[in-house]
């Protein structure tokens, strides 16, 4: 069933231009099955379409395009662990160093923790009662491995869809290599 659903968005997920950066949001992530299937497809497409030397950086951009919210703490932890595990397994299969001390692992872990949030999509609040905040990971034009991080709230997306303005203010981040985003924290 998951694969049939993903087949409906194959151009955005695997074959279209800029497929790596096309974002996907799961409002009820559960233990991450849908998110893992999305990442798995993106990584397979990356493997088929891009040179191997670009995989570490491009896989981080693929991971950064997957977002989710989960209400239950155990499911939230399972979703984060499974998504990170899928990422690490991809790199282990291809001989790319991705141990806990590598920048690749630490950046991936930071992205997963920033993009998969424990909270309630209906209220727009995280587990602590604060607004759910995500980060856009915008690729800097002309600098293939550099990202500009920009925070946004879930409610700002809902407000934009309703035609109202958001007055949320978030910190500004300097452009950085995507494999060094964990150093900003």
Segments from the language model and where they lie:
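SAM-dependent methyltransferase catalytic region
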Residues: 1-185
């Amino acid at each position: 069933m998951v694969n049939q659903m993903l087949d409906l968005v194959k151009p955005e997920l695997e074959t279209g231009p800029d497929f790596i950066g096309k974002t996907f949001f799961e409002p009820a992530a559960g233990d991450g099955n849908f998110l893992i299937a999305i990442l798995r497809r993106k990584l397979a497409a990356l493997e088929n379409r891009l040179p191997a030397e670009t995989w570490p950086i491009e896989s981080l951009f693929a991971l950064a395009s997957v977002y989710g919210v989960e209400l239950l703490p155990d499911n939230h932890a399972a979703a984060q662990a499974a998504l990170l595990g899928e990422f690490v397994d991809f790199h282990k299969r291809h001989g790319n160093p991705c141990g806990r001390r590598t920048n690749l692992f630490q950046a991936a872990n930071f992205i997963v923790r920033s993009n998969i949030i424990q909270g309630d999509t209906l209220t727009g609040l995280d587990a602590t009662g604060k607004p759910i905040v995500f980060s856009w990971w915008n690729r800097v034009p002309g600098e293939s491995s550099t990202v500009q991080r920009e925070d946004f709230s879930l409610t700002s997306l809902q407000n934009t869809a309703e035609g109202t303005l958001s007055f949320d203010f978030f910190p500004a981040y300097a452009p950085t290599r995507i494999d060094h985003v964990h150093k900003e924290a």
